[in-house]
Amino acid sequence: MTRILTAFKVVRTLKTGFGFTNVTAHQKWKFSRPGIRLLSVKAQTAHIVLEDGTKMKGYSFGHPSSVAGEVVFNTGLGGYPEAITDPAYKGQILTMANPIIGNGGAPDTTALDELGLSKYLESNGIKVSGLLVLDYSKDYNHWLATKSLGQWLQEEKVPAIYGVDTRMLTKIIRDKGTMLGKIEFEGQPVDFVDPNKQNLIAEVSTKDVKVYGKGNPTKVVAVDCGIKNNVIRLLVKRGAEVHLVPWNHDFTKMEYDGILIAGGPGNPALAEPLIQNVRKILESDRKEPLFGISTGNLITGLAAGAKTYKMSMANRGQNQPVLNITNKQAFITAQNHGYALDNTLPAGWKPLFVNVNDQTNEGIMHESKPFFAVQFHPEVTPGPIDTEYLFDSFFSLIKKGKATTITSVLPKPALVASRVEVSKVLILGSGGLSIGQAGEFDYSGSQAVKAMKEENVKTVLMNPNIASVQTNEVGLKQADTVYFLPITPQFVTEVIKAEQPDGLILGMGGQTALNCGVELFKRGVLKEYGVKVLGTSVESIMATEDRQLFSDKLNEINEKIAPSFAVESIEDALKAADTIGYPVMIRSAYALGGLGSGICPNRETLMDLSTKAFAMTNQILVEKSVTGWKEIEYEVVRDADDNCVTVCNMENVDAMGVHTGDSVVVAPAQTLSNAEFQMLRRTSINVVRHLGIVGECNIQFALHPTSMEYCIIEVNARLSRSSALASKATGYPLAFIAAKIALGIPLPEIKNVVSGKTSACFEPSLDYMVTKIPRWDLDRFHGTSSRIGSSMKSVGEVMAIGRTFEESFQKALRMCHPSIEGFTPRLPMNKEWPSNLDLRKELSEPSSTRIYAIAKAIDDNMSLDEIEKLTYIDKWFLYKMRDILNMEKTLKGLNSESMTEETLKRAKEIGFSDKQISKCLGLTEAQTRELRLKKNIHPWVKQIDTLAAEYPSVTNYLYVTYNGQEHDVNFDDHGMMVLGCGPYHIGSSVEFDWCAVSSIRTLRQLGKKTVVVNCNPETVSTDFDECDKLYFEELSLERILDIYHQEACGGCIISVGGQIPNNLAVPLYKNGVKIMGTSPLQIDRAEDRSIFSAVLDELKVAQAPWKAVNTLNEALEFAKSVDYPCLLRPSYVLSGSAMNVVFSEDEMKKFLEEATRVSQEHPVVLTKFVEGAREVEMDAVGKDGRVISHAISEHVEDAGVHSGDATLMLPTQTISQGAIEKVKDATRKIAKAFAISGPFNVQFLVKGNDVLVIECNLRASRSFPFVSKTLGVDFIDVATKVMIGENVDEKHLPTLDHPIIPADYVAIKAPMFSWPRLRDADPILRCEMASTGEVACFGEGIHTAFLKAMLSTGFKIPQKGILIGIQQSFRPRFLGVAEQLHNEGFKLFATEATSDWLNANNVPATPVAWPSQEGQNPSLSSIRKLIRDGSIDLVINLPNNNTKFVHDNYVIRRTAVDSGIPLLTNFQVTKLFAEAVQKSRKVDSKSLFHYRQYSAGKAA
């Protein structure tokens, strides 16, 4: 009921609106508008024919009439109603580079504004001769729409076709120049027509003099050369009485205060009467200001005596960068012209603006008179409004008098910043990966290092994330010095003292680096040591992170924010909510990924969430909830000279209320009008300028779905997850550019590395769209709800590229998990919908599976109106989703004989995979592939080039699509294919990206061409300059085969990307792919648990008793024969998925069902679980069955904790030499038996001198970066050379006979967990992996290394009290630990029985009550109260499966996590912690290179 009431309040709020700063009342939100569907008949075909003979087929959605004209392209991302009504397109057939057109339908084309001008259009109707698009949205949705685009075109008798490869057309025009063309329908032949021979200006100009703004004080004559309506609006708005005159009107004798010439189409030289009239003005004594726009610039230049020329491909779009020559300011402009002025300006005139990219003239000015003109459109619509100020300058000229020039009235630019002189820069990384802060910072940090090295600046990198690429110590792209240390003020201060950097970069290390930098600033450390923060200042960072300062800053510029209060207590939070009214949203200051945030429908929820939030921060913001509004993001770049560009705008498919990290996101935005797009863009730039951001930042908006009302949600003054997504979506290297800007380099001087020719001062155009979908692993966390909200829960994400929404969307869904077919009503991983499913609740309460609930609702014939009401998802997206399911229904009615080429092609165009189609047709995937290829249906390879094909690309950043007609690249490299890791998830994270990058770099160093396939936008491996060809694509059998055969690759490396590519080994091998390294057949034998165990028996290699089971009875019988506990393991899984230690018959039933669901095609193996054993990892490289490189590390924890969650020690600390020799011997036998050539990992149990094999993975493991960096030998470099048959120098490798064992240091790898984000999850370690990241540190001994590693995970050394809760069986071993902690001065608290035992053994302890018994004994304090008031700042909780206080222990653990208190749940880790605290009172700041230098010195 509470949820229903909350939903009702949200809807009521959305309908009636509430008070925002500077927001006017708006119309009520109508949940949907009816889309107009075309008649269900076959679309009429037509062709676009070019004068060079090119002929392309398409389908009509406009008027079915043939037409001829000049074919041009526009690279703008929005505003098609404004674009097609621009008079400058008269006589032209317009090609839209934006692939999806018609999303918002058409506005009321009869509506007029207060001036009598068309309200939403730029003229009195459509001016293009024809329209060419790739994909047309037959179903539209926008609150201003009254009809479809197709209907409008038909009304005005304008032909339009879709299904055209518009990128191919653009490239033809780019390479051959603008050319004539025609849209032809069957039976309607037309001849080519050259509109440039016609006086198009005369055709679009008014025939009569018209007056607008009558009675206004300033008289402006506007010469209509095809003037846009918005020019007139802007003039009248500034107080002009506008006299609009025909192009050939003699205005030379008219009285006016200023004259404006604007338009227009065609060849300006044909407008001779106008040129003569302007010449008279220029040569007369009249000095009233003259302002020319677009054609007005050309006419003014011709009248002055200059010449014009026809451009080869014209400048038409919304992202053209121009530079003001007089003050070096750069602007992004909208343009639409095919002619330009040459360099023949006479004396007295000079250029005013120049195009940054092609150096063409963009404006002229008279040196002594008030005459000026610009080639671009400052009045825009569609496009950016950055240069609208020129209208103000024009009016300033009028007011100032006649004897002045334009330069005297232009806005004064910000002072030009000088280059920042630094010689050494400290870059702070983000530390280990956690939810909300993942691999995107490895990518951004790596880019920053590269940028610094290009500018000859030395770099010191501080980051304990040993699995990251950026922490490599050797390589051309690496930092000069790397510190594996905690990112805390204490350690950073020590590094500053030692390294003496003069610059500091905070924006590349996420919230960790930002918060640390702010604290260093507050402590005065940066000032004391003379360290400059590069890029955005700390003051600006604080203004975005402190919620009150942020609110105050926005109010200074009257920007729109939700009503809010920054508070520092729960009491004040409750008061704020009462003032604002529920529901409210709370947000934490200095927090990441929405941590500490949530929607509070009532007082109780607010108390609960604010209590948890204040455990992490000292300030929260209580604001009005805007749940249900659209969430829009902009990535903004600003340099120190105040040049600004918005690199990407993104739209969350999920509405406000779901954290953007957990939302499906598309780029560019798909449901915004030009007015909405530009309003938010302009606001973004205003805010970024006001806050003083220098570099890159992300700004998030809530936009009302049926009005222009918006509010700013937050600004991230750093690189973020969205930044990485925007970089990969556009090809614009944001982190690299931001790092250059931090050095004071202005944007116009930075090259666009993709084109190699153009400037980085531009806004990318996309002729494709991308979809990002999060990857969750919530099933792994017992007790965690699948519901998602304002606090992020996803552990990774994928990004798919397509040319239709459906294609991009379905690809992205499949990328998330191999079990996902696409957009279907079926749940992933073979799960079933519950029999009591409440579908409406599933839709109204966002969850990790809601997208499938939407599919089910559509499949169940729920109306889209109802789905929209329940989800707040824009109906345009729902229309597209419905189209996918309609196609599935169509396919299910067909078979291989009845399937037509057209239907199969359409299915592929909207993202259906072969596997998906095969299930509909009742075929195998191989049969569907054969059917498709027989019909000659294959994908096309397209480039991402940042400029929608306007300029050639020098990089090979690629994707695959069925929406095309040609490839963008050739395929003569025959490179080596390397498969990446796919989305980050539990068990597969940045360590596998490190492996892939290491392999790629080795291949390139050996002179091999590389072809990389991956779909993860957070990775370094998807940085296009890491390889020769990057395919941002699915890691599926179908797509890998497509690419492999198209490229004719020399082979495929599958062993460096984790389990996803490893699982493809056998299917790829069976389809003729040459798998490099270990045979796929051997991989299959090792992955199948039963076969592998049988091989070990043959080899006489010891393992625990085992049995492959297929039924519950077999499992129960085995358990009975060996006694519980048993270990249950499925095959072909990563990170212990569905792996469990089973202690009882009930658990066996439960866990066996889960394991068989996860691994349906392979048996489940049961082994006897050996208690009290230590686990040992063997990471190795084999060559033809011989081990040539190895490292042995030891787990701190006893067996039972997944290796990914274990704390690793290298070298081993407690393992006997005899046991190590047995480990080596078993490894030797396994390598030989499986003929291993490449990387592999074997896990062992060691108890005393007994050694048992657990499992073997014939691929790289997650510990490869750790052992490689610790030993100074890149295991993947060695493995790659082995796999491709290169010679390997074994003399310096750690072979089994000659190991490399560090003598002067110990390395500790510690796991990173994200328990605070996983509400209600039990933070205890099991066989199934739960950690999200890892860190590693080094010390002279185990204790200093361990403390550094623990501190790097965010662990805080306790200062006050420690709560001890241990199960009775731990007591004998724990007494010494308790004594050590007491002797170190900690006050000990313990549950009653444990307290009695400690006191009886002379260890003072204060008894406390179990949570379930609180209040029963007044003399016992409440554990939860002691934790929350800070009396306890460490919790040690050591339960086992036999404890009767299961729930109480869970409550204690959860309370600690929710209160931000460190928690230890493993005895061995607790013991090591107590020893470390006792023995390492002061932790040094030495890192790996210090110990290496010491070892080298000793050796010398």
From Swiss-Prot:
E.C. number(s) listed in UniProt: 6.3.4.16
UniProt xrefs under Gene3D superfamilies: 3.40.50.20, 3.40.50.880, ATP-grasp fold, A domain, ATP-grasp fold, B domain, Carbamoyl-phosphate synthase small subunit, N-terminal domain, Carbamoyl-phosphate synthetase, large subunit oligomerisation domain, Methylglyoxal synthase-like domain
Annotated effect of mutating P1411L: In CPS1D; modestly decreases enzyme activity
Endpoints of the signal sequence: none
Limits of the MGS-like domain: 1355-1500
Protein role: Involved in the urea cycle of ureotelic animals where the enzyme plays an important role in removing excess ammonia from the cell.
Domains: entry comment: The type-1 glutamine amidotransferase domain is defective.
Disease named in the record: Carbamoyl phosphate synthetase 1 deficiency: An autosomal recessive disorder of the urea cycle causing hyperammonemia. It can present as a devastating metabolic disease dominated by severe hyperammonemia in neonates or as a more insidious late-onset condition, generally manifesting as life-threatening hyperammonemic crises under catabolic situations. Clinical features include protein intolerance, intermittent ataxia, seizures, lethargy, developmental delay and intellectual disability. CPS1 protein variants might influence the availability of precursors for nitric oxide (NO) synthesis and play a role in clinical situations where endogenous NO production is critically important, such as neonatal pulmonary hypertension, increased pulmonary artery pressure following surgical repair of congenital heart defects or hepatovenocclusive disease following bone marrow transplantation.
Name the record gives this protein: Carbamoyl-phosphate synthase [ammonia], mitochondrial
